[in-house]
A protein has these predicted regions:
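Conserved ABC ATPase "signature" C-loop
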Residues: 210-211
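ABC ATPase NBD coupling module
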Residues: 66-81, 105
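Conserved ABC ATPase signature
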Residues: 131-135, 139-141
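Conserved ABC ATPase "signature" region
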Residues: 110-127, 179
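A short, proline-enriched helix->beta-strand linker immediately N-terminal to the Walker B motif
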Residues: 150-154
Length: 308
């Protein structure tokens, strides 16, 4: 189990990056850390990996304290793996050689088998002999993830792991990677901007705002019962409305066109989204967004209903 207790960190005396962060993570569990740029997500991963000397607090993995550079000649925990946004690959060697870099040469068959297994996970078997320098940024990102998994870690830390990967490839890769981690009982912490990384794959989701934790729960609970606009907006567009004198956070799919309702709105714009239209409208002098199966004429007055 990973136990993070009240950790704080600052690069300079006047610039605190993390403030009183606490959470636990069980073996084989996945935590998604979300927040806007500059909120401290990447710094948290570095702290957990042991790359930083904390201002206060402690980090333990299975009763062993994780200490920073002041205590280690080579910082970082040997049985953790950290995949940063700069991949640190060997550009003039092949994809397979990069993945197998830290595997023993004394067991070539096992090394080849392990490398091929991970090439399947990242969907790059056909690129095994390609030089890394010829790959796109997204492909290099996938190679970096596979290399981190080659010597199976107990905990893997992924910083925006799908940030450079094409959308058409991202969903398939996510399913394969997170299923593989579950199968191998590898704990995982992902720092991301993408709510899809959390909703389908994380056991817990942490939201950081202004260097502090503002929400920590299952992704399902945070999606259905967001504590504030900031949390809801990490998943989707969100409308903050006063309905029956009560403030509500309402996603676009929770607003429907009604045959007859006292809630009226004027359509201003529409955006085709494939399986539906996203409609922008004025409601009580406020811009709102809602989903509709068909386009609606601009300027048309419509009646709306709100669902839970």
């Amino acid at each position: 189990m990973l136990k993070v207790s009240n950790i704080s960190f600052q690069y300079t005396p006047k610039k605190e990056i993390l403030t009183d962060i606490s959470f636990t993570l069980g073996e084989g569990q996945h935590l998604c850390v979300m927040g806007e740029s500059g909120s401290g997500k990447s710094t948290l991963l570095k702290a957990v990996y042991g790359l930083l000397d904390l201002k206060k607090g402690s980090i333990y993995w299975k009763n062993e304290e994780v200490l920073g550079p002041a205590f280690h000649l080579v910082p970082g925990v040997s049985f953790f793996k950290y995949v940063a946004q700069d991949f640190d690959l060997m550009p003039f060697t092949s994809v397979a050689e990069n993945i197998g870099k830290f595997l023993s040469r004394f067991y070539p068959e096992e090394k080849e088998q392990r490398t091929n297994e991970l090439l399947e996970v990242i969907e790059m078997s056909s690129f095994a002999n390609e030089k890394v320098k010829t790959l796109s940024g997204g492909q290099q990102q996938r190679v970096a993830i596979a290399r981190a998994l080659a010597k199976e870690p107990e905990l893997i830390l992924l910083d925006e792991p799908f940030g450079q990967i094409d959308n058409f490839k991202k969903n398939s890769l996510r399913r394969k990677l997170f299923s593989y981690l579950k199968e191998k009982n590898i704990s995982c912490i992902v720092a991301t901007h993408d709510g899809d990384d959390a909703l389908s794959f994380a056991d817990q989701m942490m939201v950081i705002k202004n260097k502090k934790v503002v929400a920590l729960d299952s992704p399902r609970n945070l999606y259905k019962n967001p504590s504030e606009h900031y949390v809801a907006a990490l998943f989707d567009d969100v409308n903050e409305l006063f309905i029956d004198e009560k403030k509500r956070l309402i996603y676009p799919h929770q607003i429907q066109v009604s045959i007859d309702s006292s809630y009226k709105a004027i359509v201003k714009k529409s955006f085709f989204k494939g399986s539906f239209w996203l409609i922008e409208a004025m409601f009580n002098s406020q811009v709102i967004f809602f989903e509709n199966p068909e386009n609606i004429d601009l300027g048309k007055e419509i009646s709306l209903s709100f669902i839970d």
